[in-house]
Curated annotation (Swiss-Prot):
The 26S proteasome consists of a 20S proteasome core and two 19S regulatory subunits. The 20S proteasome core is composed of 28 subunits that are arranged in four stacked rings, resulting in a barrel-shaped structure. The two end rings are each formed by seven alpha subunits, and the two central rings are each formed by seven beta subunits. The catalytic chamber with the active sites is on the inside of the barrel. Component of the immunoproteasome, where it displaces the equivalent housekeeping subunit PSMB6. Its EC number is 3.4.25.1. It catalyses: Cleavage of peptide bonds with very broad specificity. Coiled coil: none annotated. The active site is at T21 (nucleophile). The lineage of its organism: Eukaryota, Metazoa, Chordata, Craniata, Vertebrata. This is Proteasome subunit beta type-9. The gene is Psmb9. It is an enzyme of class 3 (hydrolase). Belongs to the peptidase T1B family. Encoded in the MHC class II region. The keyword Acetylation applies.
Amino acid sequence: MLRAGAPTAGSFRTEEVHTGTTIMAVEFDGGVVVGSDSRVSAGAAVVNRVFDKLSPLHQRIFCALSGSAADAQAIADMAAYQLELHGLELEEPPLVLAAANVVKNISYKYREDLLAHLIVAGWDQREGGQVYGTMGGMLIRQPFTIGGSGSSYIYGYVDAAYKPGMTPEECRRFTTNAITLAMNRDGSSGGVIYLVTITAAGVDHRVILGDELPKFYGE
C-alpha cells in the first residue's frame, strides 16, 4: 500500500531545458555578425554554461537559437537537412532567404507544438549579408535584430548604438556590448559570448570569455 503523501508513478516532474538567452545578428557591407550568450537553464538550475547557440544551416548560413533547447535544435536540424537537399538539387549553395523561409515554414507548421525563436543570418552571392527574424512563422529582413529573454533589457541600447555602415569589427563590438549588457541583467543569460562573422571569404568563429567581456557601470 502506498503511504499518504508518497510520490506515485508520474508524480515526478522535470523542468524543460531552455536556452533562456540573448541572441543577436547584424548586417554589414559584405556580411553579417551573429552572436549569443551560452547559458542553458532548466527552471532555476543552470544545466550548461558554455552551450553554443549558433547553429550552422549551410556553409555560409547560421541560425541563432532561443526558447526550448530541444525545440530550437530540432528546427535547426530539420532546416539544415532540407537545405542540404536543396543545395544538391540546385548544384549551388542555397540563398539566405531560402533558408529563412525553410525555418519560417517549420516554425509556423509546428507553432502549437514547438517553443522556439530562431534568427537566420548569412551571406550569398545575390544579396550579400542578410539578417532575418522568424518569430512565430513571421519573416522579416532587418539590418539588425535581437531575441531571447535578455533582449528586453537592451532594446534602448541597440536602438541608440546602431548606425548604418559599420565595419565588421564595429559590428562585433556592438554585438558584444549588447549581449554583455543583457547578461548583466537577465538571470537566464550568461556564460561566454559566441560570435560568428560570415562573409564571401568564409566563416570566422570567436569566443569572448568571461574575463574578456566589456565592463559597464555597476559592475
